[in-house]
Regions:
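Long, charged amphipathic alpha-helices with heptad-repeat/coiled-coil character
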Residues: 93, 97-101
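Extended, charged amphipathic interaction segments
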Residues: 116-141
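Single conserved hydrophobic/aromatic residue that forms the stacking wall/gate
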Residues: 1-12
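Early exported N-terminus immediately downstream of N-terminal targeting peptides
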Residues: 13-93
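Conserved, well-folded catalytic cores of nucleic-acid-processing
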Residues: 119, 152-155
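Structured alpha/beta interaction-core segments
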Residues: 106-109
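Solvent-exposed coil/turn segments that connect beta secondary-structure elements
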Residues: 18-20, 27, 84, 132-134, ...
Length: 155
């Protein structure tokens, strides 16, 4: 009985840095490349819009004294609209990139976790500690103690 307990303790000490594993997966590297490409595309479009905005701002500012009040107000409104459009586009881009990351990486993270569990099971481990900073236990086939602990506490 003491040997079984000692073996369990040894099994719990085995660990893996899941973050390192995931970051080295070829599919993850490919997904990251797709995400970076999308980020660059959005960045280029945002920079072009910002440049257009800056150019108009300079042109309108330099020409403001030669224009009527109505024209200057219309130009101011146009610039405000451009500013709002750029901000909205930046938000949309950030959300789109975040969604793309989730869509591409979630199945790969699940694939890595399943592989860790499979290897742990094959090697007879109940639990594997995730050595990633802030990582947790990765459950393989360990016993859930909830019912036993509830019984011990009398409920």
């Amino acid at each position: 009985h003491g040997i079984g307990r000692r073996q369990r303790q040894m099994c719990i000490r085995d660990s893996i840095d899941s973050q390192a594993l995931i970051s080295e997966m070829p599919e993850v590297i490919e997904a990251q490349a797709q995400i970076e490409k999308l980020q660059k595309t959005y960045q280029t479009e945002i920079e072009a819009s910002m440049k257009e905005y800056q150019t108009k701002l300079q042109t309108y500012s330099a020409d403001a004294q030669n224009q009527t009040e109505v024209t200057n107000q219309a130009r101011q409104k146009e610039l405000q609209g451009m500013e709002q459009n750029i901000q909205q586009y930046q938000q949309t881009a950030a959300q789109d990139i975040q969604q793309k990351q989730a869509d591409l990486l979630r199945p790969l993270i699940e694939k890595a976790r399943a592989a860790i569990q499979k290897v742990a099971r094959e090697q007879g481990f109940d639990y594997v500690i995730d050595a990633t900073p802030g990582g947790a236990l990765i459950l393989s086939d360990g016993k859930d103690l909830l019912a036993d602990v509830k019984k011990e506490l009398g409920f």
